[in-house]
Design a protein with these regions (language model features):
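A membrane-cytosol interface segment of integral membrane proteins
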Residues: 216-254
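Hydrophobic transmembrane alpha-helical segments in integral membrane proteins
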Residues: 1-9
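Membrane-interface helix-loop junction between the first two transmembrane segments
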Residues: 14-33
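Juxtamembrane/interfacial segments at transmembrane-helix boundaries in multi-pass membrane proteins
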Residues: 52-72
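Generic alpha-helix structural propensity
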Residues: 27-31, 35, 39-43, 47-52
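A transmembrane-helix-recognition feature enriched in membrane-embedded lipid enzymes
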Residues: 35, 40, 196, 200-204, ...
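Membrane-embedded catalytic scaffold of the fatty acid hydroxylase/desaturase
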Residues: 40-49, 67-222
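Coil-to-alpha-helix initiation sites in intrinsically disordered, low-complexity, charged segments
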Residues: 27, 31, 112, 167, ...
Length: 254
């Protein structure tokens, strides 16, 4: 993992350099600083979250007598985990209690490699709910963790505006072009291209969308918070207020 982070840090520096050479304002100091603060703060909880996820998956695996093994088992495990990633991502973009766990990732109005560092500190504690089904299919907990980590690493390098559409890969695997669409502020955009590595799931389930010129990054009506704690908590507060308003409206109609 340290080697991956080193490569990622170098990639950020290169993106900054290329952006300056091309005279493109891809980075905002405050936004970048906030993303980095969020990353390092979340890293402090990362070990605990990862341990919790492994413990929950291992507990679920105890109830399943069959196991996937060998090369075929590894390939199947990756496909299963990638599909579950798609389903989790789709739930995160629905109007449910899970939406606040993902909102902070989409609130930035900038879009560069540091955008991928934006994440809810609470996210690791809901991940087991979505990947436990892999245990029922015979996946090995360590293999699921590895596949999940590989998807996360792959996602690191999708958040860039400098890579154009890659014709042969678009609609097959996730690309920077496809992921840019996902970070658009229109509902039809951020509810599309939800796959982790493969976009086959989006193709099959009708959520694939090609990149167009009308992209504006961020979320309509939601300003990015610069305070780490406010950024982490406010999505849940806003969601709770919305639910209470619906409840009160329902009571008022009777």
């Amino acid at each position: 993992m340290p080697f991956v982070l080193l490569i990622f840090a170098v990639s950020i520096c290169l993106e900054m350099l290329v952006a300056m050479l091309l005279n493109r304002k891809l980075y905002d100091f405050d936004d970048t600083l906030h993303n980095l603060v969020m990353f390092f703060a979340n890293r402090m909880m990362g070990g605990l979250g990862g341990a919790f996820m492994f413990a929950m998956l291992a507990a679920a695996a105890q109830f399943v007598p069959w196991k996937l093994s060998g090369t075929v088992g590894g390939i199947l495990t990756f496909l299963i985990v990638d599909l579950l990633y798609y389903l989790q991502h789709r739930v995160f973009h629905s109007d449910t209690i899970f939406a606040p766990f993902h909102e902070v990732h989409h609130t930035s109005e900038q879009y560069n490699l540091t955008t991928t560092l934006r994440a809810s500190v609470f996210l690791p504690f809901v991940n087991p709910l979505f990947y436990a089904p892999a245990m029922l299919l015979g996946c090995d907990p360590p293999a699921v963790i590895v596949c999940f980590a590989l998807i996360q690493i792959y996602q690191l390098f999708l958040h860039t505006q400098l890579v154009p559409p890659i014709a042969l890969l678009e609609g097959i695997i996730n690309t920077p072009s496809a992921h840019r669409v996902h970070h658009g502020n229109k509902r039809s955009q951020y509810e599309s291209n939800l796959g982790g590595v493969l976009l086959v799931w989006d193709r099959l389930l009708g959520t694939y969308r090609r990149e167009t010129d009308d992209l504006i990054f961020g979320m309509k009506g939601v300003k990015p918070e610069k305070n780490y704690f406010v950024a982490q908590v406010s999505p849940f507060v806003v969601y709770a207020k919305r639910i209470l308003k619906r409840i009160n409206s329902g009571i008022g109609q009777h």
